[in-house]
Regions:
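Nucleic-acid endonuclease domains
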Residues: 1-77, 84-188
């Protein structure tokens, strides 16, 4: 119930979104807010995260959804939710987060305390060889959720502007209220 494998058409869509999210930064490493890993890795990271947004929309029954290009958090990732992604253990590509942050929901001081944040893992960060149709992608998995204010506790502080919430401290997905989601189907 709380996992979804993108179709090959959906992968093509999130690749386009990943490109568009990074395009305005091409060749300008000084514009990155945190640090710069190279446009190719930044674009891949945007692609993987756009995939997590699309997968979550499908998990909650939203069929008509395209991840937006807006990276400045003036729009929610999915109707009513912010989606965060955690890279899998053992991922050593430059676009993967540090080992200490894996399996955790990342929050910054810019994040809304009243918003719901959902953590996903898996998906396109897992390299696989697809040889025959239907070319099944590794599934994205919803790992848990929390309100922003629940994440900004002293025990989760990483540095002056960031918190990392362990998966064990997130609410189980089956407790997520989906009653206000437009286009939502009944989850069985």
């Amino acid at each position: 119930m709380w996992n979804y494998s993108l179709t090959v058409e959906e992968v093509a869509l999130v690749c386009q979104v990943g490109y568009e999210r990074q395009a305005e930064m091409f060749g300008q490493p000084e514009r990155n807010v945190n640090y710069y890993e190279g446009d190719h890795w930044e674009m891949l990271q945007h692609t993987i995260c756009a995939g997590s947004e699309l997968a979550f929309a499908r998990m909650i029954g939203i069929k008509e959804f395209t991840p937006h290009v807006n990276k400045f958090k003036t729009e929610l990732d999915v109707d009513g939710f912010e989606v965060r992604y955690t890279f899998p253990q053992g991922c050593n590509a430059p676009c993967c987060a540090s080992e200490s942050s894996r399996g955790r929901l990342r929050m910054t001081r810019r994040d809304d305390d009243d918003q719901i944040y959902v953590l996903l893992g898996g998906g396109l960060a897992i390299r696989t060889k697809m040889e025959t149709p239907p070319y099944t992608m590794p599934p994205y998995v919803a790992l848990g959720w929390a309100y922003g204010h629940e994440c900004k506790k002293p025990e989760f502080i990483y540095n002056a502007t960031t918190w990392y919430v362990p998966r064990a401290d997130l609410h189980p997905m089956d407790t997520l209220d989906l009653s206000n989601v437009q286009g939502m189907r009944q989850l069985l």
